[in-house]
Amino acid sequence: MNNKMLGVIDATTYIEALEPLIEQRSIAAVPFAGRYRLIDFVLSSMVNSGIESVAIFPKYQYRSLMDHLGSGKNWDLNRKRDGLFFFPSPDLLFSGERRVGAFAHFEQHIDYFLRSRQKYAVIANGYTVCNIDFDAVLNRHIENGCDVTEIRHRGRSLEMYLLETSLLLDLIADYKNHGYYSIVDVIRDYHRSLSICEYEYSGYAAVIDSVEQYFRSSMELLDRDVWEQLFLPSHPIYTKVKDEPPTKYGREGNVKRSMIANGCVIEGTVENSVLFRSVKIGKGAVVRNSIIMQKCQIGDGCVLDGVIIDKDAKVEPGVVLKGTKEQPFIVRKGTVQGEVISR
């Protein structure tokens, strides 16, 4: 493995369009694809690219994120040298500054950057789903002689950037004087003084910046071609390991074109849906075009279509819940749903 790059995951962003899913967790900790969290994709991409030092800068509701990542063992980042670093900045929440961006958080922990041995830094958010080889980005960056390389996909920024660590230190030192608060501001407003290059990523990618996009991307994973683009045997996506028994299918259990994690009990019908670990589907229940997160219970005779049910929620027997792909109906984490609701 090379050790030319350090990884920086900016988890300071709050996106209102994701609000129902992030009331009790950071965006990076939102469950995705049956057994993962959103942060797993960029973190695994970094590790698979030989990055041995990764710093995560959280801001909101980060307890579940810390619990998920732990020591970094599942990503081979529990190291004596380098490894996984977690840098919250609670003082900034009460600083009184009009705007607090990522650079303010980086400045609070500037020693991490000053002590880093890596020549280059990759800055990424924690909510872009992709499986990218940052080594390839680095090679292109060096070949083109760029100051900053921005990774894009089909005309859209993936909010991932590669630059020299020394330049990043300069940007952090000067951000107040120049009025930029994150690398995004630098790219948008100060590109004339820097050489900005673009790297076009050709694999599957999705920036999860709304409930609608979360739902759409989850449904896209049911397409085998999409799944195979994202989950590459040579570049696996790592996550927190949990031991669960195999899923149990009852006599009336029926599953079509769905993703079912371990530990589930299926006694009804599941079609075109994503079920996380330890979900229970009652007898006669019908679940279509829906996302059911871990440890949820769906009562007998329920009908769900176009629904996202957050972790540890319960839907009582006979309840009908219907949403649309543009506006899925959401049952919040840990709640009990006992009404018949359609959209």
UniProtKB/Swiss-Prot annotation:
CDD domains, A to Z: ADP_Glucose_PP, LbH_G1P_AT_C
Superkingdom, natural source: Bacteria
A Pfam family per the record: NTP_transferase
Keywords in alphabetical order: Glycogen biosynthesis
One GO MF term attached to the UniProt entry: glucose-1-phosphate adenylyltransferase activity
Keyword Acyltransferase found: no
General function of this protein: Required for the synthesis of glycogen.
Protein's recorded name: Glycogen biosynthesis protein GlgD
Signal peptide (UniProt feature, chain positions): none
Gene Ontology terms describing biological process: glycogen biosynthetic process
Family: Belongs to the bacterial/plant glucose-1-phosphate adenylyltransferase family.
The species this protein was found in: Geobacillus stearothermophilus (Bacillus stearothermophilus)
